[in-house]
UniProtKB/Swiss-Prot annotation:
Record's catalysed reaction(s): tRNA(Gly) + glycine + ATP = glycyl-tRNA(Gly) + AMP + diphosphate
EC number: 6.1.1.14
GO cellular component: cytosol
Official protein name in the record: Glycine--tRNA ligase beta subunit
Amino acid sequence: MAEFMWEIGTEEIPARMLPGAITAMGELTRTALQEAGLGFAQVESQGTPRRLLVVVHGLHDKQADVQEERRGPALQAAFDSDGNPTKAAQGFARGCGVDVDQLSRVETPKGTYLSYTLKQAGKGASEVLPGIMQQVFKALPWPKTMRWSDGESRFVRPVQSVTALLNGQQVAVELAENVRYTDAVSGHRFMGKGAVVVQDYASYQQAMADGKVMLKSEDRMATIRAGVLAQAASVGGVVASDEGLVAENASLTEWPVALLGRFDERYLEIPPEVLTTSMRYHQKYFPVLDAQGGLKPHFVVIANMETEDQTVLVRGYQRVLKARLEDAAFFWAEDRKIRLTDRLPDLQAVVWQAKLGSLFQKSQRMAHLASAIAARVAPQQAALAEKAGLYSKCDLVTGMVGEFPELQGIMGGYYLPRERAQDEVVALAIREHYMPAGAGDALPQSLCGRIVSLADKLDTLVGCFGMGITPTGTKDPFGLRRAALGVIRLLLQEQGLRLPLRQLCEEAYRQYGEIGLEMGEAQTVQGVLAFFYGRLQAHLKAEGVDYDLIDAVQGLNLDDLWDAVSRVKALVAFKQDAAYEALVAANKRMANILSKVEDSALDLTLGVDEAVLKASAEQGLAAAVAAVEDRVKTHSSNGRYAEALGELAALRGVIDTFFDEVMVMDEDDAVRHNRLRLLATVLGLFRQVADVSCLVVAEK
């Protein structure tokens, strides 16, 4: 068994790309080795901003030998009557690179055929590895690549060196132009001791440690966590958990060192979200908090090196932050000179989407739709929701949001004039209306905020679908998937909103009257509803719910997602019922029979005529259905779907008996029609909850 180590030394790889590149390099190497038939025990991948590394442990010395049996023509076609080889036999032998007399004969169920076993000896690892390295190098999934120097090769950043060692011996490979191929590796750009020759992974690790490089990202993250907490504690503060920022700093540094900085206390008069946004998102600093969660005039920054006098570095970091905070203080003062409500006309000059008008028009639509939603769930908040919708986008034309786009909505909440107590409700709704911004993002806590958020997202979805703007593959420039998932989460959160989505989508469509959407109302609304169910299916699948359960509910054409999910949850429990498989099979059979009926004289909406019931099995089924029908409908109308399915489960025996003993398609029209109406009644009861015929029974 051998050890293979491969490092690509580069200029600084962007932090957002590094974790994925480390993972991809390991996976691509593993796949390439498997495809090449070169066995191994383990593939390990590591990386820092200036290097990507793969180590293959327990690598086999050579590929496995391959035997391939080639089958030629049938024996009777391979030789003529005199026993001489035909052109077919000669051609087959020539293709195998041998004479005809070297071919074998193989017996098959179809007769005797000529054959040849081609034996191919496996290549040594040193022969195979260069091709694997080239394959992996080209396949790394970078969002963007570049050329460097005068070469034509492309990579995310210029490649400086390549070190490839198989049991201490360099592997000759050509990956790109103007690259050093060497067994010497470099440590930290500033603290390293120059290039060091390595023989294996153990000596490589030692060279990295001596050269002030923490090779493993998890080690860098642990160092960052400990350093941040220690520095914050030194001034009596704490730091909020932020694994994303920890990981980003780990991808920015090779030797992370936590340093404590401070800023002038006068900046604490600025809203805390402005300060934390500037520190976290713009400078990658960790804000320091007091015990109550308020900001202290301190921050922790992660440097990429140690110096004899760290205060020099700290002053530099403080100077950069001060410039940011000076800008923020200026915008905070200037923006408040104009009332937020007075900025509404300015939105007329801001295009929201080329085909869908300005932000002013969107605000008008949002106000109307928010009022319509509130009228259904909280009439007392209709006026507040309308006001929040109308002014929700006004902060987009402020200086602060222009400088810090992440603060959209938040600054609107601060800038809204407080003329009465209810304005606090409006301000909070404006702050929350972009929520949730992603799959794991927090949801609005206020009812008014949820209403305005729904109005915003529904307006976006209906407008885009109405103009034929829909997600395709991986492209979703207007975030429609995110918007749909946001609507789903808003409706399904703990205190869900029972809303008729179809009616709301129709209302949203009509608000585009002056613009004129390209698609018709029915087509647009149906497209949006289908899109919701597609995202709902993905959302529930992520929670472990089988796709067929959603299909069974979607078939009912419901537009209340809270109700739809309640039905799905009942089906999840129903799957555990002993009668589940039999009842699913029965529903499929009933649906199949009824779908094939072509009889213009048959009206399935008529009730069952007890006088026409002849067989005891159909009489028993009709009686059992009559006994549970009212209870099933009552349970269903009150959202007690599990109880409704429990009542229906009791029908298993009589349904089985019916199909065992009764011929549905009787020659007598009256009898046949009555039996079909009985099946339609049974199927209709199940469809009070879901289309059970859509469910799937796992094969045993």
